[in-house]
């Protein structure tokens, strides 16, 4: 593409985290280095602590030096956080709340992007019939820093002496507008369809979302907008997932629907995610730290590798290079290589490290037609 520059140097903050995090992040960095060698891109990797690893070494799940490093970088690549070792700590200093949720808030990463992709090579791994799942390509956009999860929470005793609880759901116009606008922009670059998922028949906050979305729609006449209640959406994702292109929703609904969507692909070991604030983003696999297989070279690094691909696309403005990573992953799967979580009869079992090697080798040696679709 003429006039396009994807040479860097790009500064990437790498946060291996806990459990299988260090193993899978190592393979993603390996693939990025191979891409750099192939395409002449300079990556400068900085390493920091987060989660349980940070608690063990610094006493807090998100050290200030990690935040400062992030402010100097173009993007953050994260492995995974958490594990039973830290489950008995107070919630605010556990790896998840004090590390992952806090870094999202510190960098105001307001939009979570999760692609739901169909891999023909894994059609038997999905719980849905192949004729339902075939061709599915959904991008879920979840608001990430507002709503119930971040509102005031309290317990109290009523005048009648009964225990009661309040969780507060608050959204500002700005919080809604920025994530909805991102959804429209993404839909423009895809198939031109946006579905706002809510509960507007019950919730005032959902009616607020609809009003703002309807106004923004006027700026995007080329995007088809539809509305769907969250309960119906949960059903439609199973009955007819191909109807969706871009789904936009608030924090809690998005939390549930993105997990449901992750099952469609057949393995959460394949699904990446991005949490964005404009061009800056944090990229991570959607799966957890899997402490039961940590250190055994069994983990599937493909979701982390594909997260690095998303980083190239959304933060570094390198869409062609992102596509190269995605094609390399697809080529490795087509050749029958599998980690244990997606192993099928007739396929070849490889370790975490070997899978990273295979994708890196595919990037360095693979020959791709630029017009070849994924």
Curated annotation (Swiss-Prot):
NAD(+) binds at residues 83-96, 288-300. This is 3-isopropylmalate dehydrogenase. It is an enzyme of class 1 (oxidoreductase). Pathway: Amino-acid biosynthesis; L-leucine biosynthesis; L-leucine from 3-methyl-2-oxobutanoate: step 3/4. Mg(2+) binds at residues 231, 255, 259. It comes from the Bacteria. Belongs to the isocitrate and isopropylmalate dehydrogenases family. LeuB type 1 subfamily. Its main location: cytoplasm. Substrate binds at residues 104, 114, 142, 231. InterPro entries: IsoCit/isopropylmalate_DH_CS, IsoPropMal-DH-like_dom, Isopropylmalate_DH. The record marks 149, 199 as: Important for catalysis. GO terms for molecular function: 3-isopropylmalate dehydrogenase activity; magnesium ion binding; NAD binding. Binds 1 Mg(2+) or Mn(2+) ion per subunit. Its cofactor is Mg(2+); Mn(2+). It holds the Pfam family Iso_dh. GO terms for cellular component: cytosol. SMART domains: Iso_dh. Homodimer. GO terms for biological process: L-leucine biosynthetic process. Catalyzes the oxidation of 3-carboxy-2-hydroxy-4-methylpentanoate (3-isopropylmalate) to 3-carboxy-4-methyl-2-oxopentanoate. The product decarboxylates to 4-methyl-2 oxopentanoate.
């Amino acid at each position: 593409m003429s006039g396009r520059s994807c040479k860097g140097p790009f500064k990437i903050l790498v946060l291996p985290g806990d459990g299988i995090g260090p193993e899978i992040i190592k393979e993603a960095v390996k693939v990025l280095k191979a891409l750099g060698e192939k395409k002449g891109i300079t990556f400068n990797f900085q390493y920091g602590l987060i989660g349980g690893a940070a608690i063990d070494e610094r006493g807090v799940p998100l050290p200030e030096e990690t935040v400062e490093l992030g402010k100097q970088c173009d993007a953050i690549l994260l492995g995974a956080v958490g594990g039973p070792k830290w489950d008995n700590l107070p919630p605010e200093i556990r790896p998840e709340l004090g590390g992952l949720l806090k870094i999202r808030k510190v960098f105001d990463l307001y939009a979570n992007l999760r692609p739901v992709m169909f891999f023909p090579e894994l059609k038997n791994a999905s719980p849905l019939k192949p004729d339902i799942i075939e061709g599915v390509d959904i991008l879920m956009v979840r608001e990430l820093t507002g709503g119930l999860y971040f509102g005031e929470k309290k317990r109290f005793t009523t005048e009648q002496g009964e225990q009661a609880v309040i969780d507060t759901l608050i959204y500002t116009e700005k919080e809604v507008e920025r994530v909805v606008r991102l959804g429209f922009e993404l839909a423009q670059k895809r198939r031109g369809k946006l579905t706002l998922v809510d509960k507007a028949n019950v919730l005032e906050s959902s009616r607020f979302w609809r009003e703002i979305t309807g106004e923004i729609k006027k700026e995007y006449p080329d995007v088809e907008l539809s509305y769907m209640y969250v309960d119906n959406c949960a059903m439609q994702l199973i009955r007819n997932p191909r109807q969706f292109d871009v789904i936009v929703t608030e924090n809690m609904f998005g939390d549930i629907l993105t997990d449901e969507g992750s099952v469609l692909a057949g393995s959460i070991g394949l699904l990446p995610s991005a949490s964005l604030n404009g061009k800056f983003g944090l990229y991570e696999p959607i799966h957890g730290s899997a402490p039961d297989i940590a250190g055994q070279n069994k983990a599937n690094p493909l979701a982390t590798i594909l997260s690095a691909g998303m980083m190239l696309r959304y933060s570094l403005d390198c869409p062609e290079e992102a596509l190269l990573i995605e094609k390399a992953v697809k080529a490795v799967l087509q050749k029958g290589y599998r980690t244990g979580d997606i192993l099928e009869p007739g396929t070849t079992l490889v370790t975490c490290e070997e899978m990273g090697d295979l994708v890196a080798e595919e990037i360095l040696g693979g020959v791709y037609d630029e017009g070849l679709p994924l």
